[in-house]
Amino acid sequence: MVIMATSCGSDGVSSETVPQLPGRVTVPPEEPPVSTSPTVPPVTATTSPPPPTLPPSPYADRLPTFDVARPPAPLQMGLPVDQTQAAHLSRIETADPVAFITIDDGYVRHPEALALIRDSGVPVTLFLISSVAAEDPKFFSDIREQADATIQAHTVTHSRLKGRSYEAQRQEICGSADQLQGLFGTRPTLFRAPGGLQDPNTLAAAHDCGMKAVFFWREAVNDGRVQFQEGTRIQRGDVVLMHFRQTFVDDYLAALQSIKDAGLTPARLEDYLP
């Protein structure tokens, strides 16, 4: 004998007839429970596309190597206590075997600069003319983000400051810091006067614009040659000056090699200031 059973849904309407064998009871399939929770769409994992890979610098085989790219625990130099003027420095007093590479202006955006700085693996400080940086901010932001670079102030127009009024100098210094902050998101705290020419008004205006120090230099690199103010070797704590020029590759390689020959390693200037 075949027993016919019917099942009813929750609405009381009969569903399909299920045949049953003698001695066995077939239990109708249960309907899935009705969820009262809000429906959550499935989450699809997304990843941002990686930034384009920059090919190695064609000059990578000429880059000197350093045992340590930067000191693990740099010593901070105390600045002169003056409530009215920024400190004026050309070197850092430190016992660490380090020197500091600074690159000025920004007029010439050499196509090899980014790869060369990145592949060297050492920190650099860029003292940029803000109006020039504004012409191509991506060039400098790429160096900052893909290499090990910081950006500091070097006036708005690169005009001579020494001998000008406090207010005129303040407009150049504060104006450059304001513009660089707008371009790159971080306000500079260091300043270099064009040509290194400064006077008491420069130091006072720099202080009032929030600059910790105004930097000169001990060595300058031109046409692939390092020029020394004293002696024939870079000394520990020295600040080295070069520029964004057509000779950038030769100048940068010369600066690195001179630091290497002196038994020093490039370090980040900002790490040695409070």
Listing of model-derived features with the role each one plays in the protein:
Residues 8-90:
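N-terminal low-complexity, Pro/Thr-rich disordered segments
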